[in-house]
Amino acid sequence: MPHTGSQHTLQATPKTAQHTGAQKAPEQAIALKKEQQLKNQEGATSHRKAHTEGCHTQKTRMSADKAGLRHRQGSGEVRARTASTRVEGECSSDGVVMMFCMPARGEEEKASGEARGEDVGSSRESRQGTAHKSTCMHTEAASLQKAGEIGKVEDAKT
């Protein structure tokens, strides 16, 4: 009888040890996961900052280009199209995609009229906010600020 008892104790010890080990492992994994998330956030922030700066330079270049010609830089080109805006982007050698917007067909005619320059600018910025919602944070604030003006532009069109 005492022999079986000692056997039980011996068997129980490694089981308990394994169990505690299994409990500790997820805590370490969670800590590592949190560290990784922080690193990812930092990376995303710096990427967004780089993207924002690139986006501003592209935007300036596009507004200066009345003819609506596309500027190509970098190794590749990225394109997307929504109902109101043609979005184009450049993929630089390090793989960061720089996006910029061009007005869709109907808007190109309106953009050529310089008399309504400010109105055209504000409505174009709002479209940029829509097109870039997932990638470009700085345009959202601009589109929200100009929301009042955009409403007037929409009324003026109809």
From Swiss-Prot:
Comp. bias intervals (Basic and acidic residues): 51-68, 107-127, 149-158
Stretches the record annotates as Disordered: 1-89, 107-158
Compositionally skewed regions (Polar residues) per UniProt: 1-21, 128-137
Name used for this protein in its record: Uncharacterized protein ECU01_0010/ECU01_1600/ECU04_0010
Organism: Encephalitozoon cuniculi (strain GB-M1) (Microsporidian parasite)
Upper classification of the organism: Eukaryota, Fungi, Fungi incertae sedis, Microsporidia, Unikaryonidae
